[in-house]
Amino acid sequence: MIETCLCWVGGIFIVTCIAYVVYVALEVHVFPGRSLTTYGANPKLRGAGSWALVTGATDGIGREFAMQLAARGFNIVAVSRTAEKLAILSKEIESTMPGIKTCYYAMDFLSAGNAEYEGLEQLIRHLDIAVLVNNVGLSHTMPVNFLEMDGRELASICQVNIVATMQVTRVVAPHLVRRGRGLILNLGSFSGQWSTPLLATYAGSKAFLIAWTQALGEEMRRSHVDVQLLNTYFVVSSMSKVRKPSMMVPTPKNFVRSALSRIGRSSGALGRPFTLTPFPSHAWLDWAVEHFVPRWWLLRQAYDVSLDTRRRAIRKAQRLEKSQ
């Protein structure tokens, strides 16, 4: 009798595990995300759709968000530091996607104060903003022990990754609430989820975004504004310093395509509210590490990787110094 019960329990456990893995696979690869027409995109009649505001819009992931949201029928508000790059982006969008309207706002998030945020508010006050992509971010120049970190770099990372993100959201979110439907995407990082020694300040700023996004998401849910943190591993970009794409390191174009097709899902972030790990290989890594890898071991491995990265960065800097 006992043996029969144990067999049943074991069988139920195995079937449950298999069913769970199948569900994860469906979540990562099959189940569609929410259509962007929910938020006012109009791909058939360009220019008639609502607006999407993207920060850090002139390079990498931010640029791809601006381009792909425009391709899906949103007009674009591009916000970044360099006016010349913004003008080039705006011209490219309007020339390659006739009918789409753009405007841009040059803003240095490191030094922005009340006047700059008020200027942004004035720019968008009469626009039907439906989507906000908080993409702008800053990391360390190289991995560094926290006690050896330059105080100015510490302040800069917190200013851009935390303060600027909240300030832009404070300006834009009321537009989403008033229209009765909207979307806020915050660019997160695996570093915030699992932490990364020698990148402690960056990791801490991204961990803040996890908690803040979840709290904001629950608040905004009642106003029919969807809020999601896009959990991100390495992507080819100047910030990651990775130049060659691979199965685990997508190009910005492929990453953004995955993100925009999975809105409203969790993918590899199952069970974590208001969080989406959109790129398939990242999603499986997220799920596997969360379920099978001890945090203490992960921290030690991350420390070793960061230390090796720091040593290589120092050697590169020394070679450049000698060549000058």
UniProtKB/Swiss-Prot annotation:
Pfam families in the cross-refs: adh_short
Binding-site positions, NADP(+): L53, D108, E116, N135, R170, Y202, K206, V235, S237
Pathway(s) annotated for this protein in UniProt: Lipid metabolism; fatty acid biosynthesis
Keywords for the protein's UniProt record, in alphabetical order: Endoplasmic reticulum, Fatty acid biosynthesis, Fatty acid metabolism, Lipid biosynthesis, Lipid metabolism, Membrane, NADP, Oxidoreductase, Transmembrane, Transmembrane helix
Annotated compartments: Endoplasmic reticulum membrane
GO biological process: fatty acid elongation
Active-site positions on this chain: Y202 (proton donor), K206 (lowers pka of active site tyr)
Top-level taxon in the UniProt lineage: Eukaryota
MF terms in GO: ketoreductase activity; very-long-chain 3-oxoacyl-CoA reductase activity
This enzyme's EC code(s): 1.1.1.330
Function: Component of the microsomal membrane bound fatty acid elongation system, which produces the 26-carbon very long-chain fatty acids (VLCFA) from palmitate. Catalyzes the reduction of the 3-ketoacyl-CoA intermediate that is formed in each cycle of fatty acid elongation. VLCFAs serve as precursors for ceramide and sphingolipids.
Family stated for the protein in its record: Belongs to the short-chain dehydrogenases/reductases (SDR) family.
Protein name: Very-long-chain 3-oxoacyl-CoA reductase
Organism: Malassezia globosa (strain ATCC MYA-4612 / CBS 7966)
Lineage: Eukaryota, Fungi, Dikarya, Basidiomycota, Ustilaginomycotina
